[in-house]
Amino acid sequence: MSWLEVFIHAPFKEDVEEAKEESDKNAVSIVLQFAFSLKGKPDITKMLVGGDAEHQVWQHILDNNQDGEKLAWDVFQTPHHCSWTFFNDTEDKEHVLQSAEDILSKKRDDDGLIIASSNEIKNEKPNPPHYEAKVEYKKRLKRKSNFLNTAIHCIENDISQPIVLVVTDSGVQDRTANMSEKEAKGFAEALKSGALKIAKTGALSLSVGKAIAASGGFYGKE
């Protein structure tokens, strides 16, 4: 028996009501926590997905949060394609706001993964992705290799492949390069049905038994 619990942190009603311009769209981005349970073991893996939320949204979430476990994570998806706006919205690439420190400190153990769903992160323009953001994220990881970039993590025939994370009773595992036949079949069916889509930079995928969550979508019967 496996199940998925989804907690919606944002957008907030007042932010939606105040958003009038195209430039306001990041203020109403969806921020979610996925909590995966398996075989009677609750919350084996938690994933925090930040959409395009900038630091103001994260501060709003922190100000209103009443349960720290709803912000805990084993997998963190970098907001806004690894944009610096999670840390600060100025040109000062050395000043990290407390909101970013607080969210990143919610990592549950040393095996946490941070995933940038973005183009390859280079120390050059245009951006995002911001190279400085990548540097800050990696500072928070004991294993620097646990920072994954969808554009380059797995490439076959010059095409970025989806990052596939499998949740087992011992936690989350990166199975990008060695999906089982059953998992590959389920993934292919999800793509065929249109439930999942792969961008040119690759997609972020999670599977629990037959279930696969990718880029905020959920596929499966369990």
Question: Language-model segments: which ranges?
Answer:
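Flexible, acidic/histidine-containing loops and adjacent segments that form or flank the divalent-metal
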Residues: 1-47, 119-222
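Active-site-proximal loop/helix segments of hydrolase catalytic cores
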Residues: 12-110, 114-125
